[in-house]
Curated annotation (Swiss-Prot):
Homotrimer. GO terms for molecular function: 2-C-methyl-D-erythritol 2,4-cyclodiphosphate synthase activity; metal ion binding. Involved in the biosynthesis of isopentenyl diphosphate (IPP) and dimethylallyl diphosphate (DMAPP), two major building blocks of isoprenoid compounds. Catalyzes the conversion of 4-diphosphocytidyl-2-C-methyl-D-erythritol 2-phosphate (CDP-ME2P) to 2-C-methyl-D-erythritol 2,4-cyclodiphosphate (ME-CPP) with a corresponding release of cytidine 5-monophosphate (CMP). It comes from the Bacteria. 4-CDP-2-C-methyl-D-erythritol 2-phosphate binds at D15, I16, H17, H43, S44, D65, I66, G67, T141, T142, N143, E144, R151. HAMAP family: IspF. It is an enzyme of class 4 (lyase). The gene is ispF. It comes from Prochlorococcus marinus (strain MIT 9312). Keywords: Isoprene biosynthesis, Lyase, Metal-binding. This is 2-C-methyl-D-erythritol 2,4-cyclodiphosphate synthase. It catalyses: 4-CDP-2-C-methyl-D-erythritol 2-phosphate = 2-C-methyl-D-erythritol 2,4-cyclic diphosphate + CMP. Binds 1 divalent metal cation per subunit. Its EC number is 4.6.1.12.
Length: 167
């Protein structure tokens, strides 16, 4: 074991939730309207974008995943706004002396169209994380009718974060 402390850490996050009736469709803190009135199933609000960012942040510091901190077995987190959870995760990251350098996320969904809401999502995330929204990249794509996202069974998100050690 050496005494080397890296200046940067990279984290990768992924989340997917099933589309169901009777639930809201919250992505990046934005309540979207699905053409078939579907929403994402989950214990919290099932915000795949916010969940994948949280997992990337935790993973960058080898702190486990969001289930460790907000287990679905705990009713305290039932239907909670994921931006509240994100604020708890970023507090943990900062207590360890790290800051976000940037975030890059890719949402995968056939419908609804995500692009018109990207700037609002970035604003919600940047306000929660207390970073400039230029540090956050959000892209949306389809799966070309392939896989669970392509069959409109669910929506997923991949995120990468770069953390920098504060001096």
């Amino acid at each position: 074991m050496n005494d080397f402390t890296p200046k940067f850490r990279i984290g990768n996050g992924y989340d997917i939730h099933r589309l169901v009736t009777g639930r809201k469709l919250i992505i990046g803190g934005v309540n979207l309207k699905h053409p078939d009135n579907l929403g994402l199933d989950g214990h919290s609000d099932a915000d795949v974008l916010t969940h994948s960012i949280m997992d990337a942040l935790l993973g960058a510091l080898s702190l486990g995943d969001i289930g460790k901190y907000f287990p679905p077995s705990d009713d305290k987190w039932k239907d909670v706004d994921s931006l509240i959870l994100l604020s708890k995760v970023i507090d943990l990251v900062r207590k360890q002396g790290w800051e976000i350098n940037n975030i890059d996320s890719v949402l995968v969904a056939e419908r609804p169209k995500i692009k018109p809401f990207v700037e609002i999502m970035k604003k919600n995330l940047s306000n929660t994380l207390k970073i400039d929204n230029s540090f956050i990249g959000i892209k949306a794509t389809t799966n070309e009718k392939l896989g669970p996202e392509g069959r409109e069974e669910g929506i997923s998100c991949h995120s990468v974060v770069l953390l920098e050690k504060k001096e």
